[in-house]
UniProtKB/Swiss-Prot annotation:
The keyword Cell inner membrane applies. It is a multi-pass membrane protein. Belongs to the binding-protein-dependent transport system permease family. The gene is osmW. PANTHER family: GLYCINE BETAINE/L-PROLINE TRANSPORT SYSTEM PERMEASE PROTEIN PROW, OSMOPROTECTANT IMPORT PERMEASE PROTEIN OSMW. It comes from Salmonella typhimurium (strain LT2 / SGSC1412 / ATCC 700720). This is Osmoprotectant import permease protein OsmW.
Length: 215
């Protein structure tokens, strides 16, 4: 009951931290989509790149999150931004790359060869085939990678509070430092709820964007 009262009494503060958390995750995953999807296309077209690119992305994901955030501090201190949003978003961006690149590569590489041959047969260029045939067919799997990145990094971004990025992780950090169990439970509940809601919303968006013929 104490936790519920705390959450009701601090609803405005919790909402502010939630939107801040959402913005940080959206920025990191958005950058990963911009970089990761074209990178996935590239390693499908140039297959010799697949092993080193996917290997590097996998290696990044094996680094403990607190260690990766710690590594960002001296790197970004060189440009005067050792703590705050920039190193946090960069770390989460790196974590987001693997599921997006891997799913893009898997989705495009597993398409039936006949689709590409049919596109070539009617005179489509590579980019036309990619835009009108391959990406629409691969979209459900690509979106699966985006969903994985978002849900995974809702939790990872909470740790970014230790380097001054803000977000819902502040509740956990302040709860630990102040031995306030209400803040700890409230922070954990908000992070879990946010991950569940975003996963559901992205699933609905995936259904809407998937061509009717392959739903």
């Amino acid at each position: 009951m104490d936790t519920i009262h705390y959450m009701l009494d601090n609803a405005g503060y919790l909402a502010s931290l939630t939107f801040q958390h959402l913005w940080l995750v959206a920025l990191a995953v958005g950058l990963a989509i911009i970089i990761g999807v074209p990178l996935g296309v590239l390693i499908v077209r140039h297959k010799w790149l697949a092993t080193p690119v996917l290997g590097a992305a996998t290696l990044l994901l094996t680094i403990p999150s607190i260690a990766l955030f710690g590594l960002m501090i001296p790197l970004f201190s060189l440009i005067g931004h050792g703590i705050g949003v920039l190193p946090a978003v960069t770390a989460v961006f790196l974590y987001s790359l693997l599921p997006i690149v891997r799913n893009t590569h898997t989705a495009l590489d597993s398409l039936p060869p006949g689709l590409r041959e049919a596109g070539r047969g009617i005179g489509m260029t590579f980019w036309q085939r990619l835009r009108w045939v391959e990406i629409p067919m691969a979209l459900p799997v690509i979106f699966g990678g985006i969903r994985t990145a978002v849900v995974m990094n809702i939790g990872v971004m909470a740790i970014a509070a230790v380097i001054g990025a803000g977000g819902l992780g502040l509740l956990l950090l302040n709860g630990i430092s102040g031995s306030d169990i209400r803040m700890l439970i409230a922070g954990a509940l908000m992070i879990c709820l946010l991950a569940i809601v975003l996963d559901w919303l992205l699933h609905r968006l995936q259904v809407v964007l998937t061509p009717k013929g392959i739903r």
